[in-house]
A protein has these predicted regions:
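N-terminal cap/lid segment of alpha/beta-hydrolase-fold proteins
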Residues: 16-44, 48
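Short, surface-exposed "cap/lid" segments of acyl-processing enzymes
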Residues: 43-45, 49-81
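Conserved alpha/beta-hydrolase
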Residues: 72-100
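Alpha/beta-hydrolase active-site loop
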Residues: 73, 106-128
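Primarily recognizes the serine-hydrolase "nucleophile elbow" in alpha/beta-hydrolase
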Residues: 123-179
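Accessory cap/linker subdomain of secreted extracellular hydrolases
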Residues: 160-236
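Short beta-strand/loop motif that positions the catalytic acidic residue
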Residues: 237, 243-245
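Short alpha-helix in the alpha/beta-hydrolase fold that links the catalytic acid
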Residues: 239, 252-263
Length: 267
Protein backbone atom coordinates (compact mmCIF):
# COMPACT_ATOMS: atom_id res chain seq x y z
CA UNK A 1 0.00 0.00 0.00
CA UNK A 2 2.86 2.36 0.84
CA UNK A 3 4.18 1.72 -2.64
CA UNK A 4 1.14 3.34 -4.20
CA UNK A 5 1.22 6.26 -1.80
CA UNK A 6 4.90 6.89 -2.43
CA UNK A 7 4.21 6.96 -6.15
CA UNK A 8 1.32 9.37 -5.88
CA UNK A 9 3.20 11.72 -3.59
CA UNK A 10 6.66 11.55 -5.08
CA UNK A 11 6.64 10.52 -8.72
CA UNK A 12 8.97 13.33 -9.71
CA UNK A 13 11.64 12.45 -7.17
CA UNK A 14 14.99 11.37 -8.52
CA UNK A 15 17.10 8.69 -6.87
CA UNK A 16 20.65 9.60 -5.97
CA UNK A 17 21.79 6.19 -7.20
CA UNK A 18 20.61 5.10 -10.64
CA UNK A 19 18.18 2.17 -10.63
CA UNK A 20 19.20 -1.17 -12.09
CA UNK A 21 17.15 -2.95 -14.75
CA UNK A 22 17.02 -6.71 -15.27
CA UNK A 23 15.25 -8.66 -17.99
CA UNK A 24 13.20 -11.54 -16.57
CA UNK A 25 11.25 -14.42 -18.11
CA UNK A 26 8.26 -16.51 -17.05
CA UNK A 27 8.07 -19.83 -18.89
CA UNK A 28 4.61 -21.09 -19.87
CA UNK A 29 3.39 -24.00 -22.01
CA UNK A 30 2.75 -21.61 -24.88
CA UNK A 31 6.03 -19.70 -24.68
CA UNK A 32 7.97 -17.11 -22.71
CA UNK A 33 6.36 -14.11 -21.04
CA UNK A 34 8.98 -11.40 -20.74
CA UNK A 35 9.28 -8.59 -18.25
CA UNK A 36 11.60 -6.14 -16.55
CA UNK A 37 12.67 -5.77 -12.96
CA UNK A 38 13.56 -2.22 -11.99
CA UNK A 39 15.60 -2.17 -8.80
CA UNK A 40 16.48 0.87 -6.71
CA UNK A 41 20.22 1.42 -6.69
CA UNK A 42 22.31 1.04 -3.58
CA UNK A 43 20.07 -1.40 -1.67
CA UNK A 44 20.32 -5.14 -1.10
CA UNK A 45 16.72 -5.80 -0.08
CA UNK A 46 13.52 -3.85 -0.64
CA UNK A 47 9.77 -4.18 -1.25
CA UNK A 48 8.61 -5.00 -4.78
CA UNK A 49 5.46 -4.09 -6.70
CA UNK A 50 4.12 -6.33 -9.47
CA UNK A 51 2.55 -4.02 -12.09
CA UNK A 52 -0.20 -5.42 -14.34
CA UNK A 53 -1.16 -3.58 -17.53
CA UNK A 54 -4.73 -2.96 -18.66
CA UNK A 55 -6.88 -4.44 -21.41
CA UNK A 56 -6.12 -4.85 -25.08
CA UNK A 57 -2.68 -4.62 -26.69
CA UNK A 58 -1.17 -2.62 -23.82
CA UNK A 59 2.50 -3.32 -23.18
CA UNK A 60 4.52 -3.32 -19.97
CA UNK A 61 5.18 0.43 -20.26
CA UNK A 62 1.47 1.27 -20.52
CA UNK A 63 1.52 1.96 -24.26
CA UNK A 64 -1.18 0.65 -26.60
CA UNK A 65 -0.95 -0.38 -30.23
CA UNK A 66 -4.52 0.86 -30.71
CA UNK A 67 -4.27 4.42 -31.94
CA UNK A 68 -0.52 4.29 -31.33
CA UNK A 69 -1.09 5.62 -27.81
CA UNK A 70 2.22 6.13 -26.05
CA UNK A 71 2.24 7.55 -22.54
CA UNK A 72 4.78 5.34 -20.76
CA UNK A 73 2.55 5.54 -17.68
CA UNK A 74 3.61 2.20 -16.22
CA UNK A 75 7.26 2.88 -16.98
CA UNK A 76 6.97 6.19 -15.11
CA UNK A 77 5.28 4.35 -12.26
CA UNK A 78 8.19 1.91 -12.06
CA UNK A 79 10.69 4.77 -12.10
CA UNK A 80 8.76 6.61 -9.39
CA UNK A 81 8.78 3.53 -7.20
CA UNK A 82 12.52 3.02 -7.72
CA UNK A 83 13.13 6.64 -6.72
CA UNK A 84 11.46 5.80 -3.41
CA UNK A 85 13.43 2.62 -2.76
CA UNK A 86 10.84 0.19 -4.11
CA UNK A 87 11.51 -2.38 -6.83
CA UNK A 88 8.97 -3.29 -9.49
CA UNK A 89 8.30 -5.96 -12.06
CA UNK A 90 6.26 -5.15 -15.14
CA UNK A 91 5.71 -7.44 -18.11
CA UNK A 92 4.23 -7.76 -21.57
CA UNK A 93 1.09 -9.90 -21.40
CA UNK A 94 1.03 -13.11 -23.39
CA UNK A 95 0.59 -12.32 -27.07
CA UNK A 96 1.76 -8.71 -26.66
CA UNK A 97 5.12 -7.09 -27.47
CA UNK A 98 8.08 -9.15 -26.34
CA UNK A 99 5.69 -11.89 -25.15
CA UNK A 100 4.07 -12.34 -28.57
CA UNK A 101 5.32 -15.92 -28.85
CA UNK A 102 3.28 -16.93 -25.78
CA UNK A 103 0.02 -15.84 -27.36
CA UNK A 104 -2.88 -18.23 -27.79
CA UNK A 105 -5.38 -18.42 -30.61
CA UNK A 106 -8.11 -15.95 -29.78
CA UNK A 107 -10.73 -18.69 -29.55
CA UNK A 108 -8.65 -20.54 -26.94
CA UNK A 109 -7.76 -17.55 -24.76
CA UNK A 110 -9.48 -17.25 -21.39
CA UNK A 111 -9.42 -14.57 -18.70
CA UNK A 112 -7.93 -17.13 -16.33
CA UNK A 113 -4.85 -17.38 -18.56
CA UNK A 114 -3.91 -13.85 -17.53
CA UNK A 115 -4.67 -14.62 -13.88
CA UNK A 116 -2.46 -17.71 -13.99
CA UNK A 117 0.35 -15.72 -15.58
CA UNK A 118 0.25 -13.17 -12.76
CA UNK A 119 0.17 -15.98 -10.21
CA UNK A 120 3.30 -17.30 -11.88
CA UNK A 121 5.01 -13.92 -11.52
CA UNK A 122 3.99 -13.75 -7.85
CA UNK A 123 5.55 -17.16 -7.27
CA UNK A 124 8.67 -15.99 -9.13
CA UNK A 125 9.01 -12.95 -6.88
CA UNK A 126 8.26 -15.02 -3.76
CA UNK A 127 11.41 -17.05 -4.38
CA UNK A 128 13.57 -13.92 -4.67
CA UNK A 129 15.35 -13.22 -1.38
CA UNK A 130 16.00 -9.62 -2.44
CA UNK A 131 12.38 -8.66 -1.84
CA UNK A 132 10.94 -8.14 1.63
CA UNK A 133 7.28 -7.86 0.60
CA UNK A 134 5.18 -8.10 -2.57
CA UNK A 135 2.42 -5.66 -3.52
CA UNK A 136 0.24 -6.36 -6.55
CA UNK A 137 -0.89 -3.29 -8.55
CA UNK A 138 -3.25 -3.65 -11.50
CA UNK A 139 -4.47 -1.01 -13.94
CA UNK A 140 -7.90 -1.21 -15.61
CA UNK A 141 -8.55 -4.86 -16.53
CA UNK A 142 -5.28 -5.66 -14.75
CA UNK A 143 -6.92 -4.63 -11.48
CA UNK A 144 -9.35 -7.56 -11.62
CA UNK A 145 -6.60 -9.90 -12.76
CA UNK A 146 -4.46 -8.78 -9.83
CA UNK A 147 -7.15 -9.14 -7.16
CA UNK A 148 -7.81 -12.71 -8.33
CA UNK A 149 -4.14 -13.66 -8.58
CA UNK A 150 -3.02 -12.32 -5.21
CA UNK A 151 -5.38 -14.53 -3.24
CA UNK A 152 -3.87 -17.48 -1.39
CA UNK A 153 -0.39 -16.09 -1.97
CA UNK A 154 1.10 -15.50 1.52
CA UNK A 155 4.03 -13.41 0.27
CA UNK A 156 1.61 -10.77 -1.09
CA UNK A 157 1.15 -8.09 1.56
CA UNK A 158 -0.82 -5.45 -0.35
CA UNK A 159 -3.04 -4.86 -3.37
CA UNK A 160 -3.62 -1.66 -5.40
CA UNK A 161 -6.44 -1.07 -7.88
CA UNK A 162 -5.60 1.70 -10.38
CA UNK A 163 -8.70 2.73 -12.34
CA UNK A 164 -10.14 -0.72 -11.82
CA UNK A 165 -13.77 -1.40 -12.71
CA UNK A 166 -16.17 -1.94 -9.83
CA UNK A 167 -18.79 -3.60 -12.03
CA UNK A 168 -18.82 -6.74 -14.21
CA UNK A 169 -17.38 -6.15 -17.68
CA UNK A 170 -20.74 -6.50 -19.40
CA UNK A 171 -22.12 -3.60 -17.35
CA UNK A 172 -19.16 -1.44 -18.35
CA UNK A 173 -19.72 -2.28 -22.02
CA UNK A 174 -23.41 -1.45 -21.82
CA UNK A 175 -22.69 1.83 -20.04
CA UNK A 176 -20.20 2.81 -22.74
CA UNK A 177 -22.65 1.95 -25.52
CA UNK A 178 -25.25 4.15 -23.83
CA UNK A 179 -22.77 7.00 -23.28
CA UNK A 180 -21.92 6.95 -26.99
CA UNK A 181 -25.60 7.74 -27.69
CA UNK A 182 -26.15 4.68 -29.85
CA UNK A 183 -29.71 4.00 -31.05
CA UNK A 184 -31.97 2.09 -28.67
CA UNK A 185 -31.96 -0.92 -31.01
CA UNK A 186 -28.18 -1.18 -30.66
CA UNK A 187 -28.35 -0.88 -26.89
CA UNK A 188 -30.96 -3.63 -26.72
CA UNK A 189 -28.92 -5.89 -29.00
CA UNK A 190 -25.80 -5.42 -26.87
CA UNK A 191 -27.76 -6.16 -23.69
CA UNK A 192 -29.26 -9.28 -25.28
CA UNK A 193 -25.89 -10.63 -26.40
CA UNK A 194 -24.35 -9.86 -23.02
CA UNK A 195 -27.25 -11.65 -21.35
CA UNK A 196 -26.43 -14.83 -23.24
CA UNK A 197 -22.68 -14.57 -22.70
CA UNK A 198 -22.92 -13.96 -18.96
CA UNK A 199 -24.98 -17.15 -18.77
CA UNK A 200 -22.24 -19.05 -20.57
CA UNK A 201 -24.00 -19.27 -23.94
CA UNK A 202 -22.34 -18.23 -27.19
CA UNK A 203 -24.31 -16.19 -29.74
CA UNK A 204 -24.27 -17.23 -33.39
CA UNK A 205 -26.34 -14.47 -34.99
CA UNK A 206 -24.32 -11.37 -34.12
CA UNK A 207 -25.16 -8.39 -36.39
CA UNK A 208 -22.39 -7.21 -38.70
CA UNK A 209 -22.08 -3.88 -36.88
CA UNK A 210 -21.22 -5.69 -33.63
CA UNK A 211 -18.82 -8.27 -35.06
CA UNK A 212 -15.73 -6.39 -33.89
CA UNK A 213 -16.93 -6.65 -30.30
CA UNK A 214 -18.71 -10.01 -30.34
CA UNK A 215 -17.06 -12.05 -33.11
CA UNK A 216 -17.30 -15.79 -32.56
CA UNK A 217 -13.63 -16.25 -31.70
CA UNK A 218 -13.70 -13.74 -28.83
CA UNK A 219 -16.93 -14.91 -27.22
CA UNK A 220 -15.30 -17.67 -25.11
CA UNK A 221 -12.99 -15.05 -23.60
CA UNK A 222 -15.89 -12.71 -22.88
CA UNK A 223 -17.79 -15.54 -21.19
CA UNK A 224 -14.78 -16.24 -18.96
CA UNK A 225 -14.45 -12.52 -18.14
CA UNK A 226 -18.12 -11.71 -17.58
CA UNK A 227 -18.49 -14.17 -14.71
CA UNK A 228 -16.40 -12.01 -12.36
CA UNK A 229 -17.88 -9.16 -10.34
CA UNK A 230 -14.98 -7.02 -9.04
CA UNK A 231 -17.01 -5.84 -6.06
CA UNK A 232 -17.46 -9.46 -4.97
CA UNK A 233 -13.91 -10.50 -5.78
CA UNK A 234 -12.29 -7.64 -3.86
CA UNK A 235 -14.27 -8.65 -0.77
CA UNK A 236 -12.21 -11.84 -0.65
CA UNK A 237 -8.84 -10.06 -0.79
CA UNK A 238 -7.30 -10.53 2.66
CA UNK A 239 -4.43 -8.03 2.43
CA UNK A 240 -4.55 -4.21 2.78
CA UNK A 241 -6.14 -2.59 -0.29
CA UNK A 242 -5.60 0.82 -1.92
CA UNK A 243 -8.12 2.03 -4.52
CA UNK A 244 -6.91 4.78 -6.89
CA UNK A 245 -9.27 6.46 -9.37
CA UNK A 246 -9.14 9.65 -11.44
CA UNK A 247 -12.13 11.91 -12.02
CA UNK A 248 -11.64 12.37 -15.77
CA UNK A 249 -11.39 8.72 -16.84
CA UNK A 250 -13.69 8.15 -19.83
CA UNK A 251 -14.04 4.39 -19.27
CA UNK A 252 -13.96 3.82 -15.50
CA UNK A 253 -15.64 6.27 -13.15
CA UNK A 254 -15.33 7.35 -9.53
CA UNK A 255 -18.52 5.35 -9.03
CA UNK A 256 -16.52 2.22 -9.85
CA UNK A 257 -14.07 3.04 -7.09
CA UNK A 258 -17.01 3.51 -4.74
CA UNK A 259 -18.37 0.08 -5.72
CA UNK A 260 -14.98 -1.44 -4.90
CA UNK A 261 -14.95 0.42 -1.60
CA UNK A 262 -18.32 -1.10 -0.73
CA UNK A 263 -16.89 -4.52 -1.46
CA UNK A 264 -13.84 -3.79 0.69
CA UNK A 265 -14.82 -1.17 3.31
CA UNK A 266 -11.37 -1.24 4.91
CA UNK A 267 -9.73 0.05 1.69
Amino acid sequence: ILAGLFFLCGLCCRAQVLPLEENVVLNTKEGQIKGKLLLPGGVKTCPVVLIIAGSGPTDMDGNSAIGNLRNNSLKFLAEGLAANGIASLRFDKRGIGTSASAGKEEAKLRFEDYVNDVTGWIDYLSKEKRFTTITVAGHSEGALIGMLACQNRPKVKGYISIAGAGRPAYEIIEAQVTAQQNPEAVRKEVASINGSLKNGKEVSDVPAYLQSLYRASVQPYLISWFKYNPRTVIASVKVPVLIVQGKNDIQVSVEDAEFLKKGCPAA
